[in-house]
Amino acid sequence: MLMDYAPSIDWTLALRLSAAGAKDLPNLDARSLKRLVADLRVTARRAGEIAGAFLDVDSAGATAVKVVDWNGWGTAVRGMVETVVTELELPRRPDGPVDWARRHLNAVLLGAGIRAASRRLLGQYDAYTGADTLYLVAPTIVAHERDHGFAPADFRLWVALHEQTHALQFRAAPWLRDWIGQRAREVFEDDASPVQGIAAWARTGDLASLLVSGAAGESLTRLVGVMTFLEGHADYTADVAGRPHIPSVASLRKAFSRKPGASGLGKISPSFDKSAQYRDGLAFCREVAALRGRPGLRAAFVEPDNLPTPAEISDARAWVRRVHG
């Protein structure tokens, strides 16, 4: 198995480390902060209504909207991680010096990761704990507005449209959460040998192949393909549904455009190239919409077999032929 035991994490330490650098928070007085939180909540509700009408889904998005700072985001991550680990039903490691060391090392790594991610993350829809909650990371949103000169009303609605679209994807396809969970379990339950992993790495050039191969590798590839579609679909909806409401939507998309070519982790592991997921998923959705209109995209949420494969993400016409005939 990729994981034989539930990960040991000292969450108190992890969250303390993730909170380091609170002085980096945008300088807002109490009154401005209160207005910001209220505005983001109202904007998120409006975004849910706009996206729901655009996608023809009888819902206004996530049940709960939480506006958080970086500390609040760390707490949310803990809840999501613990829920996923519980659902994997992995046993706990025996207590002892080795587990103590592992617990603290994991806390340092996770705390640093949460801290780095929270400074970039604008929002997140939690589809996996059953809480049906949309998080908006207020300090990161404000920092982007100031750094790039974005119009706050436009940028906040655009971000909220993307995240509410994720909520509506799971409304349109109630089976999607279980489908993703099953693929994740197949990956974590992999029994591939190191030799199989090295052979797969040599064949694919993807470092992720060292961790999983065979059927689990196929599950990971399939999962990455679907996540690519979901991110692209959320970007497409934010752009097109937002166009009548966001005067600067074209400028926002240009500012967030991902250039071709892998960068960072993507150079050694295409499976974890998040920038490629946004870029390729958006290109797929644009082409399908050009060929079949918005109803053509909705077909992906009818049943699991309609979800695009990784190969189809790169060849939207192939997906249209398979699903629409």
Give a label for each model feature.
Residues 43-140:
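Auxiliary, metal-adjacent structural segments of Zn-dependent hydrolase domains
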Residues 222-325:
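Pan-zinc metallopeptidase signature
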